[in-house]
């Protein structure tokens, strides 16, 4: 294991997560090997940036919302600037976490070891079934998930269990290989395809993580529509056969 690989920097894209970001940052800072947490506040209208900074994260801010992929790239670019200023901060491993994990982010340690030891190039968390705030099951996620999973399978031959999971650990080399990232919510799907096409190793790991699950209200439906748009674009840019979504909707 190289010294650089053993140094882990946690990257957290965040928008309007003031209620959870401090707990997420605090839990991430205590993970083994994590030396730094960088949060990109992606145009929040609340106190996300202030709460993240108070919890010990380095904060990069977008004046307007630019999407998840752009937020991750800005945070990694900020890491590069820090490394130029102080070579002791050089990190060979990145841990990508969603901002709404809260204290459950403390369970992400199993993602790290396979990457820093060289057993895997990219690890992905498989989350348990999620519930909304009122205790009901999360709803309406099937079409996006199925589109992502079938698209990845058609392009690579591998069928993922968690194609949309944002909880990922990877080497800097793998991140650079997958860059520029697919835009917005297509980031994870694009990354998975690019890594597999490069002949690298992906390991999915079951981890007990909890995030703010979406329901079936209008806001949730609009969110999933944006996800489907970005996932479809990421797949199309990588050669997915046109009409995939129509075939899934028709049950083919």
Predicted regions and their residues:
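Donor nucleotide-sugar binding loop of glycosyltransferases
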Residues: 17-20, 44, 104
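A conserved acidic beta->alpha catalytic loop
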Residues: 41-49, 101
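Conserved donor nucleotide-binding strand/loop of the catalytic core
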Residues: 38, 49-88
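Short beta-strand-to-loop acidic/aromatic patch adjacent to the donor-nucleotide binding site
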Residues: 85-102
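Acceptor/aglycone-binding surface of glycosyltransferases and processive sugar-polymer synthases
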Residues: 63-66, 70-76, 91, 104-181, ...
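Short beta-strand/loop segment that forms part of the nucleotide-sugar
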Residues: 12, 25, 34-43, 60
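Short, well-formed alpha-helical segments that are part of the catalytic scaffolds
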Residues: 16-30
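Hydrophobic helical membrane-anchoring modules
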Residues: 1-4, 180-252
């Amino acid at each position: 294991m190289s010294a650089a690989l053993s140094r882990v920097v946690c990257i957290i894209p965040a928008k309007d997560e003031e209620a959870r970001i401090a707990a997420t940052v605090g839990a991430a800072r205590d993970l083994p090997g994590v030396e730094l947490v960088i949060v990109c506040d992606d145009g929040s209208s609340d106190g996300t940036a202030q709460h993240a900074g108070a919890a010990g994260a380095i904060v990069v801010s977008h004046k307007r919302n630019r999407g998840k992929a752009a937020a991750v790239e800005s945070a990694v670019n900020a890491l590069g600037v820090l490394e130029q200023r102080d070579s002791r901060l050089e990190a060979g491993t990145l841990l990508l976490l969603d901002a709404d994990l809260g204290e459950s982010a403390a369970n992400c340690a199993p993602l790290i070891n396979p990457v820093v030891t060289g057993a895997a190039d990219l690890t992905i968390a498989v989350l348990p079934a999620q519930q909304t705030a009122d205790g009901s099951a999360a709803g309406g996620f099937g079409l996006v998930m199925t589109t992502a999973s079938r698209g990845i399978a058609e392009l690579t031959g591998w069928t993922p269990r968690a194609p949309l999971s944002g909880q990922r650990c990877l080497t800097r080399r793998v991140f650079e290989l997958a860059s520029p990232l697919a835009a917005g919510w297509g980031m994870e799907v694009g990354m998975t395809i690019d890594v597999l096409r490069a002949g690298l190793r992906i390991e999915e790991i079951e981890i007990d993580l909890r995030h703010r699950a979406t329901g079936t209200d209008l806001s949730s439906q609009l969110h999933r529509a944006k996800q489907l748009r970005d996932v479809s674009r990421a797949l199309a840019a990588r050669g997915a056969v046109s009409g995939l979504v129509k075939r899934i909707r028709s049950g083919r």
